[in-house]
Amino acid sequence: MYNKIETSGNFVNMEEKIAKLWKDKDVIQKSFDRNEDGEYFTFYDGPPTANGKPHVGHVLTRVMKDLIPRYKVMKGYKVLRKAGWDTHGLPVELEIEKKLGISGKPQIEEYGVEKFVKECKDSVFKYTSLWKDMSEKLGFWVDMDNPYVTYHNTYIESVWWALKTMWEKDLLYKGHRVTPYCPRCGTALSSHEVAQGYKDVKEATAFVKFKVKGEENKYILAWTTTPWTLPSNVALAINKAYDYVEVEQNGEHLILAKDLAEKVLEGEYKVVKEFKGEELVGTEYEQLFKFEVPDKKAFYVVHADYVTLTDGTGIVHTAPAYGEDDNMTGKKYDLPLINLVDGEGKFVDSVTPWKGMFVKKADPKILEFMKENGSLYKSEKFTHSYPHCWRCDTPLLYYPKDSWFVRMTSLRDKLLENNNKINWNPDNIRTGRFGKFLENVIDWGISRDRYWGTPLPIWECECGHRECIGSIEELKEKGINVPDDIELHKPYIDGVKLTCPHCGKEMTRTNEVIDCWFDSGSMPFAQHHYPFENKEVFEKTFPAQFISEAVDQTRGWFYSLLAISTALFDTNSYENCIVLGHVLDKHGLKMSKSKGNVVDPFDVLQNEGADATRWHFYTASAPWLPTRFSEDDVKETQRKFLSTLWNVYSFYVLYAELDQFNPLEYKDFVSENVMDKWILSKLNTLIKTVEEDLDNYKITEAALELEDFVDELSNWYVRRNRSRFWSTELTDDKIGAYKTLYTVLTTIVKVAAPFVPFMAEEIYQNLVVNLDKDAIESVHLCTWPEYDLSVVDNELEGQMDLAYKIVKLGRSARNGANIKNRQPLSEMLISTKSLPDYYGDIIKEELNIKKVEFGADLSKYVNFEIKPNLPVLGKAYGRYIPAIRKAISSMDQMELAQNINNGKSVFINVDGLDEQIELTENNLLVAMQGLEGFAFAGSSGVGVILETTITEELREEGFVREILSKVQNLRKESGFEVADKIKLYFAGNETLEVVIKKFEEHIKKETLAVLISYNEDREYVDSKINGEELKIAVEKQD
């Protein structure tokens, strides 16, 4: 009837078998096709780059992204799950440069742009098979056979439509400004790309003396963290609100901020004059490096609000060619712009001492030069956060150039409004990391001076006219001899000319491609080739109900999605977002190849399986927190949840197969057993709780609720009901046990299906499909179980939960006293209200206690120690801690402990403080310990006391329990079946022989022994029975 299963469970083999079943039955496609008439639920899959290998961070994103769509399919939604590939941009180009052994744009041009672009195109799916393999192994169900691909002409055409729409809204413009620039890649970067590449670096700073014009030995002391920009200096910035001083030192007069003088100046000095910064404004000084003569007035002091007294001298060197703040100041005061650096980040020929040298490498040479000519006051190492290229790791320069921008500053208010509509998990992303980024949003520099990307569809004429093309049809209409099969990439698109409608001359496409983040941010509509086709599909599936990616996407995909949808559609493109933290090694350190601590996800999947890996990520921590990950962590996850569920499943199949129990024959049977009613009530409460959690995207909470339920199912329900399954007759009570456990298992696999799809399917196939040929063929094609209020009994759940809690506390007290559970004890005192006798009997049986007493006063059996929780109270009331300690010690310790343990607050007064201090379980530490002869345990308002004195009678019973345990283990080790009769033999201990004879009938009954014999000559197993030696042998009765 049921397939035989391995009790240990080889989960990896099981998952391979289930993956084959899904393939053979086309279950994945059937899941995609389900609920054709249902309400749409849209999930966007953030496109990875397929020319890079998947790593453990991608495992996290895939398991999180998979769960919600699975759940929504079971809830009746039509869920779109289209995979995508991000195929353009620097990541691809850099890989090809590496492959070809070339570096930088000049070598690419020499190699040939057409050949280079072809290499890029051919490479983008290099690791597709690895991505597909990982996705299949994980059970990540997205349509990878029909993905959207950002280099396809249809996709590019939709992106062109978006750019044309922005052009028509006057959001797309060309500007000359200082932009973050990668000299190695030869292109500008956007602000959100820059935000992803900051690193703390230690560099030499310069305190530079600028000679005041017309004054002998008088200098303005300025500071810079970028000495290479000094040859382009045209002004010095101060803050007119600050106080400045002129000091005399070693015959020189130096000017700097008053509050920084002591920190900056070395040696003795004398203050000659003190004045407001306003007096400095307009002061002229001599040019520091005379490599270029400026074409405008320069070399004087200006005011700037960004000058602070945090570091430096309160005077900042200003070079408008190389910094955003400097550039704005330059525009404000109409300062000249001296650019002495070429597109590769090297000094031009006019900078004779350092021509052709990369500017960062020139820093020490410049410092040495200034030291020799006396303009360097001093140099110090300074650690600061500096932007690096997010792809090649080169330090960025801020560089003046023509670029194309999207006018995001004009959309700032709408961006913030749309951001507030998004349900962020965690919520603080809205106003924190992402919200702050939006508050300070700048125009998006989307153009890239590169080769492999979506070409910017703007054509320019020498007369000044510009055209933005929004479709292939428009290109053919306005272009000259455009081929029908036009390839929209460079260099082919560069050959397409337009005729200028104003002057009749040829128009040429601007040379740039666009930021690849614009590509991925366009996927909501570009994946459907909107607006050229699939208009209805797009409108039904926009915005997405759910997305999830790593936290760094707040500066990447999360931003580009919101920015583009706000610009085009005036709304947000996603409604719910789970932000994921980073994956760390087992010690909590960032994984890196150099440290040798990178965990290969394929190894873990091969050794431990997908379900265990998935469950680890669902339960290890909240999704947005950093998660430690190692194979050992996954093993522990498997033990806690999967193995527990498997053991319950195995237990059911073992006994149901023995009895040939078919639940379909008992569909209308209703059990009156209290434990059955309790577990069915708990099951339905679980269904409702998990449903509410998943509806609110609380994945960890839902998973932990499920884990707790399975723990109670195994360690309480099954444990308490084993004997019902052992009965030889198929009584109503046994039918009730079977029917209940079957119902729980076949329901729980539906709840667990989105989390652990393989094990859920395995159990479903054996328990449901095996028995019913008309059953739905996969658990993943089933509907979510319905919450049945009629079986929910909150009072029953509360009573049973309290009994179980008391049992766990009793076990804890036993462990604390180092007394095994098999050793009977005389009495247990319980602080809580009385429970019906049924539960008292359970507690006695579970804890091996003769008597229980509810509502007991435990104060006479315990010592209390109540102390302030210093990290909490100390932070709030630091200097009052001694007085708080005194107040606490003067109170009734038992009463205070009971109030705190019951969740009540207690208020105290302390000398010197007007307000009362509230004492709670959060700011107090309550330690309670049983007195001699008693063991205590307590938690959340429940306390128990065990009397630990062991009488001779109790000691004998303890021996018997221990002997029964040893015999049962020997039965298992000998391979006996559960129902096999045995013969028992003991030897080697007269004391225990007396006890065995006294309890012989009981031992026979419990072990199915037909004979007990003593001191025969045979092979025995040596055993320890509570410190006593005993020889035991078992033999199967023929």
Swiss-Prot record:
Subcellular localization, per the record? Cytoplasm
Residue span of motif 'KMSKS' region? 590-594
**Co-factor(s):** Zn(2+)
Q: Name one GO cellular component term.
A: cytoplasm
Molecular-function annotations in GO: aminoacyl-tRNA deacylase activity; ATP binding; isoleucine-tRNA ligase activity; tRNA binding; zinc ion binding
Q: Please state the protein's primary subcellular location.
A: cytoplasm
- Record bears the keyword Ribosomal protein: no
UniProt KW keywords: Aminoacyl-tRNA synthetase, ATP-binding, Cytoplasm, Ligase, Metal-binding, Nucleotide-binding, Protein biosynthesis, Zinc
Which Enzyme Commission number(s) are listed? 6.1.1.5
- Which Gene3D superfamilies does the record associate with it? HUPs, Isoleucyl-tRNA Synthetase, Domain 1
Give the residues the record marks as binding ATP. Answer: K593
'HIGH' region: where is this motif? 48-58
- Assembly, per entry: Monomer.
Task: Say which family it is in.
Answer: Belongs to the class-I aminoacyl-tRNA synthetase family. IleS type 2 subfamily.
State the protein's purpose: Catalyzes the attachment of isoleucine to tRNA(Ile). As IleRS can inadvertently accommodate and process structurally similar amino acids such as valine, to avoid such errors it has two additional distinct tRNA(Ile)-dependent editing activities. One activity is designated as 'pretransfer' editing and involves the hydrolysis of activated Val-AMP. The other activity is designated 'posttransfer' editing and involves deacylation of mischarged Val-tRNA(Ile).
Q: What is known of its domains?
A: IleRS has two distinct active sites: one for aminoacylation and one for editing. The misactivated valine is translocated from the active site to the editing site, which sterically excludes the correctly activated isoleucine. The single editing site contains two valyl binding pockets, one specific for each substrate (Val-AMP or Val-tRNA(Ile)).
What name does UniProt use for this protein? Answer: Isoleucine--tRNA ligase
Q: Which organism is it from?
A: Clostridium novyi (strain NT)
What gene does this protein come from? ileS
